[in-house]
Structures are given as structure tokens and as C-alpha cells.
């Protein structure tokens, strides 16, 4: 009876060691799975944070810049303008390019806002009107591939017919007026241009 008892105790010790090994392996597996899950969650959080930061930067910075430092005032009678110290602007035009590192800008989804001492008006691009006839503003690609998107190394001319009735809320642009023009893309900060107009206009005045 004692021999059998000792054998039973040896078997119990052996079983206990095997059980401990199984439990240890289980702990290792669980720890590995937990680490993998936490690592994956960390990568996801990092990617999500990067995406949020990138989106914030795009929304806070402008993708358009003025090409050169001037805007041009067409004060000819053909543009319904008038020259001299009591003149008025017929059309305003200027050139824009994409900023370094900026995102492409779809001009068909862009709006122009004008602020004067008289008032404020914002108008989106209208592709159903005829440039130079009944459009409040339009664009032409001077260096580009002919589409509606401003991309790297491209230059677009934006023309604003300030005498178009849709701009009636801003009044006339006369000598010595202060005018702010904003080009507002669908994403990102606007390109803001503020100018004080000269005391007298010629047929083509740049400021």
C-alpha cells in the first residue's frame, strides 16, 4: 500500500508540473495577443492623429498665392470703366498660382468675396454664364493643362467684372477706395488681397 501511495504522489507531482507549463504557455499567448492588440491600437491612434493634423494644416493654410504683387484695374470704356480722378473700375484681374506644398484647387468650387466701404458680397463660380458678357467673375489658364484645377507650376488669370449687377452690393470702385478681395477655395484658408486704389485711373492701372 505504501508503494502505491508513493507512486500516486509522484504522478501528482508530474501532473502539477505539466499543468504549470500549460498555464505558463497560456499566459505567454495571452500576453502576446494583448501586446499585438495594444500595438495595433497605438498604430491606429498615431495614424488617426496624423490625419487630423494634416487636415488641420490644410484647412489653416492657403493653397493659392498671388502671382506677383499687383492686381490690374481695367478702366476702359469697353469694360464699362472710366479714367481720371473721378473714374471707376470696370474689371479687376490678377494671376494666381499654387503655393509650395499646397493642395490642388478646383476653381469651379471656389468663390470670390469682395469687401468695400459700401458692403460685402460673395459669389461662387457660375459655369453657365458667358465670360465677358454676363459673368460676375471667371478664370483663364495662362499656364496649365486647360482644366479647372490649379496645380503645381500652373498659372490662372481671374477676372472680376465689378459692374456686373450681381456685385451691386459693393458699390463702385473709385479712386482712393480700399478694397479687399478674397479667393475662397473649397478647402483651406482664402487668398486675401487688400489694396488702396490710386487717386486717378488710367486705362490699365496696376496696384
Curated annotation (Swiss-Prot):
Family note: Belongs to the archaeal flagellin family.
Location relative to the cell: Archaeal flagellum
PANTHER family attached to this UniProt entry: FLAGELLIN B1
Ranges annotated as spanning the membrane: none
Biological role stated in the UniProt entry: Flagellin is the subunit protein which polymerizes to form the filaments of archaeal flagella.
Keyword Metal-binding assigned: no
Classification via InterPro entries: Flagellin/pilin_N_arc, Flagellin_arc
Keyword annotations from UniProtKB, A to Z: Archaeal flagellum
Organism: Archaeoglobus fulgidus (strain ATCC 49558 / DSM 4304 / JCM 9628 / NBRC 100126 / VC-16)
Record-given protein name: Probable flagellin 2
GO molecular function: structural molecule activity
Pfam entry (one): Arch_flagellin
Residues cleaved off as propeptide: 1-14
Listed GO biological process terms: archaeal or bacterial-type flagellum-dependent cell motility
GO cellular component: archaeal-type flagellum
Amino acid at each position: 500500500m505504501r508503494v502505491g501511495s508513493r507512486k500516486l504522489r509522484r504522478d501528482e507531482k508530474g501532473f502539477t508540473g505539466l499543468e504549470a507549463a500549460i498555464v505558463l504557455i497560456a499566459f505567454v499567448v495571452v500576453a502576446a495577443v494583448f501586446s499585438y492588440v495594444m500595438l495595433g491600437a497605438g498604430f491606429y491612434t498615431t495614424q488617426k492623429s496624423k490625419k487630423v493634423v494634416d487636415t488641420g494644416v490644410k484647412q489653416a493654410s492657403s493653397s493659392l498665392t498671388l502671382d506677383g504683387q499687383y492686381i490690374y484695374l481695367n478702366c476702359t470704356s469697353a469694360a464699362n470703366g472710366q479714367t481720371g480722378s473721378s473714374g471707376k473700375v470696370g474689371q479687376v484681374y490678377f494671376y494666381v498660382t499654387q503655393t509650395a506644398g499646397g493642395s490642388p484647387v478646383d476653381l469651379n468650387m471656389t468663390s470670390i468675396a469682395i469687401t468695400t466701404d459700401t458692403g460685402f458680397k460673395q459669389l461662387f463660380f457660375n459655369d453657365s454664364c458667358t465670360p465677358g458678357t454676363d459673368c460676375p467673375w471667371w478664370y483663364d489658364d495662362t499656364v496649365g493643362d486647360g482644366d479647372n484645377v490649379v496645380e503645381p507650376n500652373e498659372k490662372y488669370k481671374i477676372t472680376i467684372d465689378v459692374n456686373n449687377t450681381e456685385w451691386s452690393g459693393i458699390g463702385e470702385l473709385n479712386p482712393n477706395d480700399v478694397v479687399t478681395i478674397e479667393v475662397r477655395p473649397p478647402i483651406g484658408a482664402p487668398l486675401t488681397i487688400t489694396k488702396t486704389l490710386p487717386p486717378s485711373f488710367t486705362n490699365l492701372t496696376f496696384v
